[in-house]
Amino acid sequence: MPHFLDWFVPVYLVISVLILVGFGACIYYFEPGLQEAHKWRMQRPLVDRDLRKTLMVRDNLAFGGPEV
């Protein structure tokens, strides 16, 4: 029995990791929003102006008045 586990456990772990990596790649390539978000983020570096705009939008959304 130990001889079986000597090769089965490493093979099982490698196959499990490959399946998880493949599943993640499928989600990345077949989910349209993920690729566009990643491309936009890599196009240009984040500047202070963008950070301030993001914080302002976040504050306005979080602490906005009640909608009537």
Swiss-Prot record:
The keyword Cytoplasm applies. The chain crosses the membrane at residues 7-27. Highly expressed in brain. GO terms for biological process: neuron maturation. It comes from the Eukaryota. The keyword Repressor does not apply. One of its GO terms (cellular component) is membrane. Its main location: nucleus. Keywords: Cytoplasm, Membrane, Neurogenesis, Nucleus, Transmembrane, Transmembrane helix. It is found in: Nucleus; Cytoplasm; Membrane. It is a single-pass membrane protein. Plays a role in the regulation of neuron maturation. This is Small integral membrane protein 45. The lineage of its organism: Eukaryota, Metazoa, Chordata, Craniata, Vertebrata. The gene is SMIM45.
